[in-house]
UniProtKB/Swiss-Prot annotation:
Positions of the UniProt region annotated as 3 X 8 AA tandem repeats of P-P-L-P-P-P-P-P: 1520-1543
A GO cellular component annotation in the UniProt record: nuclear body
Expressed in which tissues: Expressed in numerous tissues. Expressed at low levels in myeloid and monocytic cells as well as in CD34+ cells; expression levels are higher in myeloid malignancies.
Protein name: SET-binding protein
Biased composition (Basic residues): 1146-1159, 1450-1459
Taxonomic source organism: Homo sapiens
Compartment list: Nucleus
High-level lineage: Eukaryota, Metazoa, Chordata, Craniata, Vertebrata
Amino acid sequence: MESRETLSSSRQRGGESDFLPVSSAKPPAAPGCAGEPLLSTPGPGKGIPVGGERMEPEEEDELGSGRDVDSNSNADSEKWVAGDGLEEQEFSIKEANFTEGSLKLKIQTTKRAKKPPKNLENYICPPEIKITIKQSGDQKVSRAGKNSKATKEEERSHSKKKLLTASDLAASDLKGFQPQAYERPQKHSTLHYDTGLPQDFTGDTLKPKHQQKSSSQNHMDWSTNSDSGPVTQNCFISPESGRETASTSKIPALEPVASFAKAQGKKGSAGNTWSQLSNNNKDLLLGGVAPSPSSHSSPAPPSSSAECNGLQPLVDQDGGGTKEPPEPPTVGSKKKSSKKDVISQTIPNPDLDWVKNAQKAFDNTEGKREGYSADSAQEASPARQNVSSASNPENDSSHVRITIPIKAPSLDPTNHKRKKRQSIKAVVEKIMPEKALASGITMSSEVVNRILSNSEGNKKDPRVPKLSKMIENESPSVGLETGGNAEKVIPGGVSKPRKPPMVMTPPTCTDHSPSRKLPEIQHPKFAAKRRWTCSKPKPSTMLREAVMATSDKLMLEPPSAYPITPSSPLYTNTDSLTVITPVKKKRGRPKKQPLLTVETIHEGTSTSPVSPISREFPGTKKRKRRRNLAKLAQLVPGEDKPMSEMKFHKKVGKLGVLDKKTIKTINKMKTLKRKNILNQILSCSSSVALKAKAPPETSPGAAAIESKLGKQINVSKRGTIYIGKKRGRKPRAELPPPSEEPKTAIKHPRPVSSQPDVPAVPSNFQSLVASSPAAMHPLSTQLGGSNGNLSPASTETNFSELKTMPNLQPISALPTKTQKGIHSGTWKLSPPRLMANSPSHLCEIGSLKEITLSPVSESHSEETIPSDSGIGTDNNSTSDQAEKSSESRRRYSFDFCSLDNPEAIPSDTSTKNRHGHRQKHLIVDNFLAHESLKKPKHKRKRKSLQNRDDLQFLADLEELITKFQVFRISHRSYTFYHENPYPSIFRINFDHYYPVPYIQYDPLLYLRRTSDLKSKKKRGRPAKTNDTMTKVPFLQGFSYPIPSGSYYAPYGMPYTSMPMMNLGYYGQYPAPLYLSHTLGAASPFMRPTVPPPQFHTNSHVKMSGAAKHKAKHGVHLQGPVSMGLGDMQPSLNPPKVGSASLSSGRLHKRKHKHKHKHKEDRILGTHDNLSGLFAGKATGFSSHILSERLSSADKELPLVSEKNKHKEKQKHQHSEAGHKASKNNFEVDTLSTLSLSDAQHWTQAKEKGDLSSEPVDSCTKRYSGSGGDGGSTRSENLDVFSEMNPSNDKWDSDVSGSKRRSYEGFGTYREKDIQAFKMNRKERSSYDSSMSPGMPSPHLKVDQTAVHSKNEGSVPTMMTRKKPAAVDSVTIPPAPVLSLLAASAATSDAVGSSLKKRFKRREIEAIQCEVRKMCNYTKILSTKKNLDHVNKILKAKRLQRQSKTGNNFVKKRRGRPRKQPTQFDEDSRDQMPVLEKCIDLPSKRGQKPSLSPLVLEPAASQDTIMATIEAVIHMAREAPPLPPPPPPPLPPPPPPPLPPPPPLPKTPRGGKRKHKPQAPAQPPQQSPPQQPLPQEEEVKAKRQRKSRGSESEVLP
């Protein structure tokens, strides 16, 4: 063998150029390489001889093709550098998971991903992982250690290698020596086949050299089979002793020797098994596997293994198959050894670095190609399969070496991992392999045919270069995927082949192998079963292979026995640690292996889900995508060998560069794949996606995560494998795109999207790869279009199918660390605490949180809820958190992320409902929104989220999330939804995100889970959010359940919240939706959702939990809640949570919004249109106004405030008009004022929806009553304004501020709803007329005059007037409530009269303007969808901000406690937060109780403030129906309101209390909320008047 290897080395050197063309002829020879002397026919003959002769032609091939193969190997090495860890880890994960079990997989994954060649060298015991790592690790080490050299060599040899890859593959296949010769050769770059090194491999030197170079390789062989290396050598040497040794001698100089030595080392490991098999089989194996060392010894065996798996008895067929059974260990060891050999070879030679890179890329390419190669080899012909499979695997040795170890476990996963990874490329690859297998031309064959002029050589070689480019990253995923398949096949199929080591001649093996491998590839579970069975049933070979497999997987004995260089204890002891070291080079992905480990632990099948996330890492995913797409493009034509050859030749010409045509093809493939994914998502082919996608998911995801997250996962090898590095994972930034893929793929929400995609795409693998990477990463930067859709479906499918919730977790988060990272990242998108029920989880699934998110998504996959425990743990703890927040987090992710998988276990019903509505849209949007939202959270919580989104979400996610995440769509850029927050967040399913079923289920699951998970994970105070989450069930109902969930959803799950907001803003569910948000924010309060007063009281009482949650969630609603909640309160009252929700939201607003207010106020000083800044600026401005007001800047601040607030008012009037319109439904029932406003909006909304008649009547009556009421209120308001002339402007500003706050979460609302706001302004003027007493003035009263007037009557605080106003507000808002309740008519009138007296002229005129604006707004209500959209966006932005901030209530409280005293004093009396406006109006009405409505009516004459308001709101202030009819609702006794509407008084109290923190300057409610409420209170006062007018008329 040595001589043959030397010969091959020499020949490779000499024949490098020779075999470039020969590679074309070589594949044809490969079919005939069964026993023909390969040497005799350099071209076709090379691949022909399987036995002794095979070596010489192989040698020639390696000489001629060796460099090319090494170039290819290097290309693959590069890929492996990118995807080595992936494949390695994936293999480890897959194999361990499938063959050994979750724990084993865990170790193996960690080791593989973690430890590259060093690991392989050091660990003989964990041969499988080491084998995989050997391939990956070696490649990785090549890439990392000798990156430049390996890369250079790869590039150098890439063209040659491409051509020669097939030749080398064939030759290598024929020459068993190549792996040995190639592995030993130190000159991975100089001579691909280093004769000296391979000589070491040859004979007994193989072991020493394996030890020296690839300890893992050799000690794999040694551990599992002491004579494995020797037997392989003997096998190689026996049949091809002279030639192979000669080749080996020749090879060392050649770079292919390194690759082939690697493969040979693997073959040595597997070669022992081969030795156990038969000489012919060994020849084949050596030809198929030993040649692999140049490319990837393991890949060659996978090819063989695939063949043998297909033809497990025919392990002999390619030797690769024979080697496959030992490959799981042997191939793994070989992989590691090969990699280490390559590394060792590479280390000596500067080229070796390059070669290593090249080999890594080559490994990647080969890994993919190995899938193809194995398929191709199987397809091609027995001889050709031997040569081709061996040759392809050899060519793909770097790539396929891992592929082989992974193939046995991953043949099952191949369908999953490969699908996932080949989603773009591997989808076609998978399809093509299946087709090719069926047609007899495997992917490898196609590749070889394409690449090599000859059937296999041409296909393979060009493909190797192109795949090297394309699959460099893809290859790791695909390679892992293929490797996973190979490994599955190896244990299953190769084990069987090993069982029949004597399985007859390579040709026979080859013949059967195609058949059996075909089924295995086609049936990944069969492959897995075979792998399991074969791994177990391999008695003689299994001794070595079992030892190797156990060692490889568990790294049991040999690892500790041979932990030479890396860190023998760690590498030996912990496969995880082994994975860690490789992480350096390509260990970014390897993280996913630890995730897989966690997954494995959590779920029996950690294999399938893990791969998707690991595979679908951002870099890997993108590259994978390109490669896969290129490969797909090639594969589709690849079925036709000539076409494939031509295509691949083209690409071979551009080794590292994809032809424009190829890129176009890839893009086309991506587009088609995306379409397929979307179609599949739509079709919701969850069973296909589940079955086909679940295993492949694991491989790609695991590989990607392993590579990306492997290091951090490895930080805590034992115990906290994932946690250790998961939180501070670097890949987080990188992971988010892949996190999205993995997130999506991993998270069931992503699988939801991906699932429909799965059927269209290769139902199994493409769904994850194409869906998650292609569909999910659009947002994740991987899939522009279906970022969060694809992966989730895949993962969801996986979980549904395998119930691999843990698997999906591992997919998103391989280890706990990664899981946490994924969850963290995914949940970062939707901050676990605040945005727990936001798609943010999904967004970040692909990264650190990808694991958690992936499980969340997987949870979304309904089927995977159980496995969500592992996911949940990712964010907080490995398993503990997952199980803790598995329900809330998982479910939340479940719900929030599109749960495409109908098989989602607990949330299936809701998920299915949502799935229909929100599956793909929600996935994409959720991922987008969550990703966006969580990205800010990532900044805040980079630790947890960094790892996750590197999911996303791929992973979160992100496949996560891909996975969130998916999901880093909504939450990450959540704050940036200024004008288009809705589009950003709800880009796809904006309207579809409001399906009641989806939100119904989602809110509960999402909110609770998000609150639990996010709060626990991300926040120090998760309980309160959790409470809200728990009560989020209300979110389920768009109007009422959603109120809790909806409000919570905005920040928690923007989509849900947005839909609710949109519903609230839209005519359909204007108030309920927004109320949902409010309630959702006050979900804990929402328990007493039924009685608004109770709820308010509860809200107030529950301030700690509910108010804090509100402070968290309601902060975003704060602006909208101040205004919107007031408007929403009437509707909220019907939901029976409006008051509490508002108060809670108000309080929350004070906390969260205060921070944002000041922050954003400074940032946004004049940018009122910024949705995220809406609340911040309005609140900040209101706070400034409030502070200045409180600071006796009565007119000074109003002047300043008037200017600023004038802008704000104009903007807010627009946004508030829309906000109010949507909220009016809430307001209608909450307060007469709010009810009036809400009634009008509700009317408009009902005009759209069903409630149009009564709300319209209410609005009409309100407008009618608002005429007189408006006169009174105007007078009152004008009085207040006259008191503070700028107060009129301030009132405008307050209205604007209220509106702005209301739309703070709806940044776009303001701009979009300017027209609607005009209408709303008029409407509000009408409402103000109705609520004339307090509405304009309270908002102006936010100005010190109005506020002080109110305070004067109420409480002697800083704002004396505001205090009386607050008292009046407490008394009067109940009057509007009574109006709403029918008891408030007199009260409203009386209160309105008094308030109107106070705010007579200016307020009345302002109210008139508001009425006009409301009238316009009524018109615009038809256009309410725009405003609804904006409001939803604004609310979502607010919630997103809250979620990002996380310390919403704390911030709130910090922000406004000083103003709270006034408000808190009145807060108890204060009505619901909705009453903030309503209270403002009633308070302002009651502020001057002596002022009768008549006086207020005259006060309305005051045009100063009215002129100002009209000037401010001139747009909105078109001629409105401002008939100031005496406010009938106002006449009702003002005192009764508080007692008569106990719900409202309670609500006002809660609201006031909430508002107290928010606007202390306002009346009770307005005091704390005064900062946010100056305008908001204006709006609320107006709304109260409106609501009072409308509701007093509607209700009375």
